[in-house]
């Protein structure tokens, strides 16, 4: 019995010891689990602090890393915003960062307003420059127009002066009314009738009482025919006056033209018969005689006055 009781006691002691050991073991395990829980609770904060920040990529997809090692723990602005932070410490840090972000945003807005104002000034300056350039171009065009008008007035004045001089020359060469039987009105009527009958090659001479046939055109120049002195008789007898002018021009003493090679010679040959008989014949050197003077008078001059008032041919 004693042995059985001792065995039971031993069994009870062992059981109690096992219970105590199990309880102590369970208590140690519980303490271990509590410590591991605290370590696990503190570990994520340290790991979160030591963990590298998330990769930042710009629009091109390039990773933007901080330039300095002290900036490795930097966080984006959204991390510190009121929407992203929920904890107490996180809320405090988020509040400070939010204040900084607000200050930065205010400075950026101020800079943006300054830039906008500068851009507005820059935009306004080109418009003002464009307006000033347009005004300058208009002024230059106006000055050019005034210059052209002044030049036109000057040319008109010169033309008027030339016409006045031509009228004076015509009045000096034409006979007076007292000496001639007819005056300027009769000659104007004749010139107008001729202009109506035939088209003249001198359209600008219609304003003056001059018939183009009065002008003798030679290579040496243009001369007035001698028939201008008999202008009075042309109104009454135009054909007779024409014939008289042709005869008188044929009898007129001719002069050297001064254009041909013999006229340009300045030295006599002293060998021809004219040079040998100079004292008796009073003839010019044969090598210096004008080519026009060698021709006959009838061939030298064409018809001076044409009945239709048309232009006459050049002398050949």
UniProtKB/Swiss-Prot annotation:
Keywords per UniProt: Cytoplasm, DNA-binding, Metal-binding, Nucleus, Zinc, Zinc-finger
GO molecular function: DNA-binding transcription factor binding; methyl-CpG binding; sequence-specific DNA binding; zinc ion binding
Primary location recorded for the protein, binned into one broad class: nucleus
Induction remarks: Up-regulated by BMP4.
Positions contributing to Zn(2+) 2 binding: 269, 272, 275, 285
Renumbered residue ranges of the record's region Disordered: 1-95
Tissue specificity field: Expressed in neural stem cells (at protein level). Expressed in the dorsal telencephalon.
Task of the protein: May indirectly participate in activation of the NF-kappa-B and MAPK pathways. Required for DNA damage-induced ATM phosphorylation, p53 activation and cell cycle arrest. Involved in myelopoiesis. Acts as a mediator of BMP4-mediated modulation of canonical Wnt signaling activity in neural stem cells. Binds to the oxygen responsive element of COX4I2 and represses its transcription under hypoxia conditions (4% oxygen), as well as normoxia conditions (20% oxygen). May repress COX4I2 transactivation induced by CHCHD2 and RBPJ.
This protein's domain notes: The CXXC zinc finger mediates binding to CpG-DNA.
Protein name: CXXC-type zinc finger protein 5
Organism from which the protein derives: Rattus norvegicus
